[in-house]
Each structure stands twice: as structure tokens, then as C-alpha cells.
């Protein structure tokens, strides 16, 4: 059931220091399981990449919550790619074929994303909305 076109919502909060600790402990093995090449390239060009990784981690969690599946059996970390508009800087997500098929089975639509981070926390909010009809 949707409310005025909303199919699902998801929010996630990540402590940036925990992300830094995970990256320091497990390195590329951890990063490669969670983040795609373009996400890694974007984060690594930043002065404190773990803050940007934390925000993208939060987006992936929030998307899985909006879909009502969590991450695991139905969609994985690499099925959700966080993108950034080159002109506006606005975040968006690109879903893999597998995640797109899941979304289609559950009502289609599109995913809207907002993310932010401070020195201590990264937060993401996702709203999964039905496609507009003419």
C-alpha cells in the first residue's frame, strides 16, 4: 500500500569513525565488497575519504530499508551505486539489474536520496516513490 505515491522510506545513520576503523582494519577487502569503482574513486579523491564512504554506506542501508528487504538475500551492497550529479552535486542512486527487477516486482518507481555528514556522523534518507502518471 502506498501513501500518495510513496512506496517506502528508509533512513540510516553511520558513525564516521566506525567507517574509518573498518577501512583501516580490512582495507580494500572491505571497501571492494561494499562500494563500486566509481564510488571508490569519488571517496578516495577526498581529504577524509571515510566520511564520504560512511555517507554512501548509509544510502545503501536506507535504500534497502525503503525496499523492505534489508541487504542480503534480495539485494547486495554492490546492487546500489551512489552517484553524484556533476553539475548540482545532488546525490542519486543507480540500481543494478537485480535491484531494478526487485523494485519493479514491488511497484516500480524511483528512488530519491538525501545525504549529509558531519565530522562524527553520516545520514541518508531515501524515499521510494511511484512513477508519475499522465
What does each of the following model-derived ranges do?
Residues 1-134:
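Core catalytic alpha/beta fold that binds nucleotide/phospho-ligands
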Amino acid at each position: 500500500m502506498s501513501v500518495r505515491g510513496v512506496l517506502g522510506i528508509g533512513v540510516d545513520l553511520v558513525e564516521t569513525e566506525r567507517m574509518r576503523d573498518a577501512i583501516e582494519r580490512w582495507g580494500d577487502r572491505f571497501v571492494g565488497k561494499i562500494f563500486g569503482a566509481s564510488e571508490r574513486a569519488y571517496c578516495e579523491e577526498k581529504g577524509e575519504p571515510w566520511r564520504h564512504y560512511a555517507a554512501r554506506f548509509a544510502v545503501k542501508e536506507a535504500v534497502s530499508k525503503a525496499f523492505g528487504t534489508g541487504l542480503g538475500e534480495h539485494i547486495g551492497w554492490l546492487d546500489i551505486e551512489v552517484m553524484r550529479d556533476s553539475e548540482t552535486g545532488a546525490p542519486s542512486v543507480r540500481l543494478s539489474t537485480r535491484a531494478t527487477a526487485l523494485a519493479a516486482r514491488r511497484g516500480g518507481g524511483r528512488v530519491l536520496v538525501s545525504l549529509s555528514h558531519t565530522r562524527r556522523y553520516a545520514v541518508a534518507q531515501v524515499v521510494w516513490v511511484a512513477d508519475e502518471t499522465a
